[in-house]
Amino acid sequence: MKAELCQFCLRSGILCSKCRAKLERGEVTRLDLEIARLLVSIEDKYPLLQDVYFHGAVEADNILAILVRRGDANKILSYGGKIIRFLEDKTGKSIRILEYNTNERKFLEDLFSPLSILTINKIWLPDGTVETRVILKGRKKSSLNVNAMREIAKRVRGITLRVEFAD
Ligand SMILES: [Zn+2]
């Protein structure tokens, strides 16, 4: 697996001076380090992980979003979801795999999966700010943590979501 942290640090958990500086500057967080090391620990079992670029992890409420490069989400989602279950067991969180640098529609589809998106559009507010409205198919599901999803979208993509439901 590739990441902002070097292979030595990912494997040993001991930070070299370069990686420690990244941590101190906030370019890498403790959470990033923790998740990256979990992924590295199962690389031999799931070799597709060797090609995955891990960009970081973002936590909101009980949801942990794992950010990977465009095209890498499927590698983690293969193996019948075993990698997801491993991460859920280890962290106690609900896991989402998101591509941080993909197009906005794909990002939102992955964020709200398995719900399907009917419409995405922009709303310009009188104060000049823009919201991205996402209309999901179905009635509001209590299992969907809308606030956590909004926070993840804000932190990863800088977009303000307005989430609605329609049949
Ligand atoms: Zn290092």
Question: For each of these PLM feature ranges, what is it?
Answer:
Residues 1-167:
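RNA-contacting regions in translation and RNA-metabolism proteins
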